Amino acid sequence: EYEFINTRDQIPIYVAANAPKAMMLAGELGDGWVTSRTNTVEGFQDAWQQVAKGVEKAGKDSSGLDRVLFSTACLLGPNEGLDSERVKTQAGPWATVALHSLYETVKDPDAAPAPIRPTFAKYKAFMDQRLQSKDDYYFDLHDGHCLYVRDEEAQFVTPEVIGTTTMTAQPDALLE
């Protein structure tokens, strides 16, 4: 009666999904897809193929499905590299989120993106040892998620991990 809530207009539903079955459901049921799965064009296109299967199953037009990619970006200064302390501070928290996600979903270091396989293998061994006796491992694994890099994880925030898991580059390169 007072119209505090709009119940007449359709509200789009965005579905957050990073795993293949969930991405298919996002395409089937959602009006939009939200992911943090990848920072490469190829990876995003691969992930989109899973979403598209759900879109097709629902008989929808894929051009009407919005796509949202959560990531972090860090613009490199002139002559600045991926190993600078400023870059590690800004991009590191997101880079460790990628390691956390790989640890939970990929398990096999050989299945990780090629540039970070050696670092991920070390990270996996580190976390296997750290979490072996914890029932609530996910609290420890995801501590600092997107906010800060834990001291003990700083060794894994390498230029390769930053370059592979974040949108960190010179401004012109990010425009591409």
Which role fits each region the language model picked out?
Residues 16-25, 167-175:
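Short, acidic/polar
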Residues 6-12, 30-31, 60-65:
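Short, well-ordered coil/turn segments that N-cap beta-strands
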Residues 1-4, 44-175:
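An alpha-helical appendage that flanks or caps ligand/catalytic pockets
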Residues 25-34:
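Glycine-enriched alpha-helix->loop->beta-strand junction motifs that scaffold or abut catalytic
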Residues 13-16, 33-35, 65-72:
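Hydrophobic faces of well-ordered beta-strands that scaffold small-molecule active sites
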Residues 38-41:
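Short, acidic/turn-prone active-site loops that include or flank metal/cofactor-
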